[in-house]
């Protein structure tokens, strides 16, 4: 039986190209492509995404008035069937790049009913080996998914624990797990 092709959007918030969370994104993408899915990876560090100013003009316009890349990324999220959000953990939270995008997505809250059935994967990396140190980050991602992406489904969480130096995640079991997750999405 042939598996239907899915539109997979991977959002890497890693500030380092080939950093640990970025490498896990690449492995997820490799698995998803091998399974026949259409994959796009966005590196937020290569995009301009300013912080939300709380002006709420977006509530009238259905788009943010800031002229940067956030609107286009949110549009891609609206059309994806699988969304991967990947972030390193900085001081018990997601990094600023991903938080800014999440905040800026408020411009399309009225459309968030469109996420029914959208599958989410979370990739979280940290130097600490204790997964509980990532719980606040995961709760923030889950809160966004639960409260703003109503009807979406969490398919899995990949923990890149104990990965501090650039590329250290390659030696961890999660590296293979990311590939397998991509194949199974």
Predicted regions and their residues:
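Beta-strand-loop-alpha "switch" segments that mediate conformational coupling across diverse proteins
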Residues: 155-161
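Cofactor-binding loop segments of dinucleotide-utilizing enzymes, especially the Rossmann-like FAD-
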Residues: 13, 44, 125-127, 160
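Short, glycine-/small-residue-rich phosphate/pyrophosphate-handling segment
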Residues: 96-97, 110-155
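N-terminal beta1-alpha1-beta2 submodule of the flavodoxin-like/Rossmannoid cofactor-binding fold
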Residues: 1-86, 90-111, 153, 165-185
